[in-house]
Amino acid sequence: MEDKILKDVLQVLLDNKADDIVYLNVTSFNPLAEFFVICTVSSNRQAMALANYVDDVLSKNGIKVKHIEGNSTSEWILVDGIDYIVHIFVKEARIRYGLEKMWSDLPIIKVG
């Protein structure tokens, strides 16, 4: 992996105890984004905190976050960093929505 911003995003997720972290290069599937990152956390509160950490990392790398969808009671928080879309789920929601299945024709890279 050569993308510094992606590395920084993945590192902040690892440092803050996200589980089951994967990423996909979606440029062939979605011309509006480069990477989708998906991870699992143990609580809604942890999800919101991680969303804020990801926002900070992207901002420090010159990426303006377009939107953070969700709040401290959400089971799924999406951080829209334009080229870097980060999906943060509590476990039950990740299973229920099964996002990885939607992109099953793309390589899914596991982290950690």
Model-found features: residue ranges?
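Short, intrinsically disordered/low-complexity patches at protein termini
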Residues: 71-73, 102-103, 110-111
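C-terminal structural segments of small proteins and small subunits
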Residues: 78-107
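Ribosome large-subunit tunnel/peptidyl-transferase-proximal elements
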Residues: 1-52, 56-66, 107-112
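Mid-chain, well-packed structural core segment of small domains
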Residues: 57-89
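Short secondary-structure capping/turn micro-motifs that flank functional sites
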Residues: 30, 74-75, 95
